[in-house]
Amino acid sequence: MLNELRYELGKTPSISSAVALKAVFPGCLLTLAVMPFSSIIAGWLFYLTGSLSVFYVATHLRTIIAAKRLLLIPLCLLAIGLTNLIWYHHYYQPDSLLPYVYNAYRTSAHAGILGAFILLTVLHISQKNRQQPLFYIIAICIFALGYAFYQSLFSGMHRIGLVFGTATSAAYFLTFIGALSAQALLKLNSTYKYYLYLGHFLLVTVAILLTETRAAIFVYPIVGATILLSEVRHSKPLFIKAFVGSSATLLLCLFLFQETIHQRVNDLINDVHSYSMNNSRTSVGARIAMYQSGIEAGEEALLGQSAEQRAERIVAQAEQKPNLAGAVEYLDVHLHNEVIDAFSLKGLPGAILLVLLYASLFYFSFFVLRSHLSAALLFALLMYGLSDVILYSRDMLIAWLMAFCLGTTLTGKWLKN
């Protein structure tokens, strides 16, 4: 009944419907395509797509509200975006010593609000008009991989970063577009699609290894293998071949990049050892220090506080506990954990809204759409949110949202009707 209602929404011809059908999906595709080369232009495309989606939602408000189960994720995104804006306008001062923190929350708030409307529009376009732009999605991944390998070979960069600058952001983007294009490959009507998938799996994994981002090196192989195995789970021979093929691909990557992986594992062990010796001025040690100090700072301001107040509390903690000193170096950015960063600045309301978003994504992925791709993207979002922030970063939030929106056209319960 829910799906039938959803599909009826796109049947009434109108200018706004035509705009949504002709512009929203191309807007999502163009945003993803341009992002690894220019995050500024990608942002403009996203804002244009979001503005068109606002127009569509405003002219279809009654029918959109009727499909209540499809409102959960957009409402949570909208609430988080509005909360971020309220926090920004309440605490920001022009002479702030931490402008990056405020600017990041402001821009991510805009992305979250417009993303909510884009997702609403995508979910309410009728099934027969939902585009499955397989070749465009695959092409986007090819261009992103080409740029990544170009940087590795000719730019002299130790860790590739695409246009984002930081290798971690590049790894996250490659994970999202890699998962999306992997599913697109599996939708092809070709006897060679599984071989193409394994080649794609190899190339994306290699590109992520070139970023040397530990979280992504762990997460993407799970995401990629899960998508493939979920697709062939009803055929035992195919499942066995897929398992062997994905395992062989990972073993090949381990062999080709054994020095890189060995070095990153050693760095992890050394960082943990340093933290045990009260030295938190390492990558892992600083994260542990940020988690502890962020929780303690949030507990002292359960209804929220400014970035300056949080910084003062964490500096005071570091003076009393030297093992928390590593957190001080990151006070002008974020605390490298989605929930803790939200809790430390927006208090319990901010943390609760974030948990509600995760819960709504879980409910939608497993009980509404029933999509293994949506579940894989949720897994990536959760795992990256443990040691970094995605919703706090405008570019990564946009990339994840566009991948999630386009992913609803590729797999799921209602595509089988």
Language-model segments: which ranges?
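Transmembrane signal-anchor hairpin modules in multi-pass inner-membrane enzymes, especially those
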Residues: 1-94, 121-131, 135, 184-192, ...
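Alpha-helical transmembrane segments of multi-pass inner-membrane proteins
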Residues: 28-29, 113-156, 165-233, 256
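Aromatic-anchored transmembrane helix interface
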Residues: 48-50, 70-84, 94-122, 135-142, ...
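Perimembrane helix-loop-helix junctions
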Residues: 54-61, 221-243
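A membrane-periplasm/extracellular boundary helix in multi-pass inner-membrane enzymes
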Residues: 231-277, 295-299
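Long extracytoplasmic/lumenal interhelical loops at the membrane interface
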Residues: 281-285, 289, 299-346
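Hydrophobic transmembrane alpha-helices and their immediate junctions
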Residues: 345-379
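Transmembrane alpha-helices of multi-pass inner-membrane enzymes
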Residues: 377-384, 391-417
